[in-house]
C-alpha cells in the first residue's frame, strides 16, 4: 500500500501501475470534502515520492465515481470573505494541478456518476475511460455558481469552447456516447470491461504507443481560438444563454465570461480567473438560495426515506375516477412500474383517462425517452374497469372523483367495502378536510390525503395529508408509493387548503385587493413574472380555472374567516358570474387562441375591462414594489402560520412545498428563506407598512418575537 486514508487509497496493481481509489468511509457516495481534498494532496505526494510508479489509474470503490463537492460545506465556506474564498479555491486547484503534472501517465476509470468536482478530477487525468452506464457533467450552475476545480479551464481546452459552454451553462448530465462524441472521454466500454479498458490505455501510454505528454499539453495552454473566433463564439453564446437563463440566474453567463476572459492564458493564470469569478458568484443571494434549496431537497429525501421502514409494499394500485386527472395518475403509476386499475362509472370517462395516459406515453416515445415496447408495457399496466371485481388485491386506492365532500364520502365508503382490510385509501383532494371525509369510513386509520398537482406528469410535489386518525403505516405507505411514482412527497397535517393552497390563496387575496384598487392586472402579471414567478397571478388563475379558484377561495374563507373572508365582490366573482372561466372555456382575465402547436395562447381582451369595472372600488397609486409586497407579504405570513400551527414540520418542507407545488421562484429559495434574505425584523416592519390592508398582512406574535431576538428560519 503506497497510501491509505479514510477517503483515498493508493496501491500497486501490476508492474509499476498503481490505483488511486476514492472510497469515502461511512458514506454511500464519494464527494470532495475537506478530508478528501487533503488526502488527495497526500496521495499525490506519495505517488511522486515512489520511483517505481509508472502510471496511475483513478477509480472508485462506490457505485458512483464522485458526485461532486460536499455541498454541506458550502454554507460555511461561502460566508468567508471573498479573498479567502479565492485563496481556498486556488489551494484546492494546486492539488488537482499537482495530480495533472505527475511525471507519469494517468487514466480515470469512470464507473458511475461523475459530476462537478468528480468530473473535474477526471479532466485532470490524461485519459478517461467511461462505463456505458455512467454519466458525467458539471451541474454547478443549478446551485448559482460555476465549476471551481478547473472545469471552466480544462473542459474548453479538451472539447472546444462551444461544447464546453453548452455543458457548463446547461449543467446537464451527459451519457457515455455523447461524451465520447465530443472528446470528453477517450473510450467507452461495458461496465465489466472498465478496469481492463483503463489498464489497456495506461499500458499503451507507458510503452510510448500513446503520447500522454502531447495529450496533456493543450490543457496547459491558452485556448486555440483567434480574436475573431473568440468574439463570435462567446458573444453569441452569452446572448443565447442569457435569453435561456433569464436575468435572475447569472451563473451560466458568468461561466461563459470566465471562459472568455481566461481564453488567452495558460492553465495556472486561467485558474486564477476561474477562482475570482467563482468567489463572486458564491457570495450572491442566488447561490445562497439555490444551495439552500438543494440542502432542503436532501432533507426532504431523508424524511421520505425514513418512512420506508414501516411502509407496506404497493404492488397493485387503483384510481377511482378516470378523466384527465385519473388518467394522469394512472400514467404516472404505470410508467414507474406499479400496475393500476382505473375505475369509473362512465365508459366515456374511462376512454378519456386512457387517451390521456396514451397521449403522455406517446409524447415520451416521440422525444426518445421511452421505447414503443416500454409504452406498450405501461399501457398494459393500466386496466380500465367499470366494476370493483378486481379490487380484492389492491394495496392502495387513490380516489380522484369530483371535488365534492358528499360524493367523495360516498365513493370512499363504497370502495372500503371492496378492498382488503389493510388496503390504504387516499383522497386526491385540494381543499376538502381529510378528517371530514374520514367520518364516512369504518377504518379511518387506513385513510390519508394524497394531493397531486395538475398536470400530474409535470408537477413534482405530492402532499400526503395526515388526518387525526391516520395511522403511521398509512402515511408511510402513501409516501413510499408517491416516491415510487417519481414524486417528491411532503407530509402535512389536515387543515383547509393543507400547505400549498392555504399559502396560495392569500397571494391571490393580495392580487384581488390590487385589482379592486384599480391596478391593471396585465401590469401585475408583468411585475410578478419579473419578480421570478413562472406566470403572473391573473394568468395562473386562468390556467387553474376561475371556477376552481372561486370554489377554493370560498373553502379558505370558511376555514379562516378572520383573515381570508372578504365581504366585497372580487375580480374572481365578477369573472365567475360572467362565465369567463379561464383557459377551459377560452376566456378569463385573458382570451385564448390556439397556437400552431395546438396550445392555448393568451391575448388581451378589452371586454374584460367592463366585467371588472364594478369591482374596482378605488384608484390607488402603487409602485411595482408595492405590487410585489401586496402579494408576497400575505403569502409569506401564511407560510409562517403553517409552520407555527404544525401543518408542516420544518421550514425546509414548507419552502420546498412552494417551489415544487406552485413554482415559487427557486432563486429566492422559498417563502421562509425570502423572509430571511430580507431579515426577519425588516420583514415584520415591511408587513406593518401594509397593516391597513387587513389581517392577512399582520405578523404573528411569534414572528415578532423572532424579529426581536434576531432569529432566522435557516441558520
Curated annotation (Swiss-Prot):
Pathway: Lipid metabolism; fatty acid beta-oxidation. Keywords: Fatty acid metabolism, Isomerase, Lipid degradation, Lipid metabolism, Lyase, Multifunctional enzyme, NAD, Oxidoreductase. Substrate binds at residues 297, 501, 660. One of its GO terms (cellular component) is fatty acid beta-oxidation multienzyme complex. It catalyses: a (3S)-3-hydroxyacyl-CoA + NAD(+) = a 3-oxoacyl-CoA + NADH + H(+); a (3S)-3-hydroxyacyl-CoA = a (2E)-enoyl-CoA + H2O; a 4-saturated-(3S)-3-hydroxyacyl-CoA = a (3E)-enoyl-CoA + H2O; (3S)-3-hydroxybutanoyl-CoA = (3R)-3-hydroxybutanoyl-CoA. Residues 1-190 are annotated as: Enoyl-CoA hydratase/isomerase. The record marks 120, 140 as: Important for catalytic activity. The active site is at residue 451. Its EC number is 4.2.1.17, 5.1.2.3, 5.3.3.8, 1.1.1.35. Residues 312-715 are annotated as: 3-hydroxyacyl-CoA dehydrogenase. NAD(+) binds at residues 325, 344, 401-403, 408, 430, 454. GO terms for biological process: fatty acid beta-oxidation. GO terms for molecular function: 3-hydroxybutyryl-CoA epimerase activity; delta(3)-delta(2)-enoyl-CoA isomerase activity; enoyl-CoA hydratase activity; long-chain-3-hydroxyacyl-CoA dehydrogenase activity; NAD+ binding. The keyword Isomerase applies. Involved in the aerobic and anaerobic degradation of long-chain fatty acids via beta-oxidation cycle. Catalyzes the formation of 3-oxoacyl-CoA from enoyl-CoA via L-3-hydroxyacyl-CoA. It can also use D-3-hydroxyacyl-CoA and cis-3-enoyl-CoA as substrate. Heterotetramer of two alpha chains (FadB) and two beta chains (FadA). HAMAP family: FadB (MF_01621). In the N-terminal section; belongs to the enoyl-CoA hydratase/isomerase family. In the C-terminal section; belongs to the 3-hydroxyacyl-CoA dehydrogenase family. This is Fatty acid oxidation complex subunit alpha.
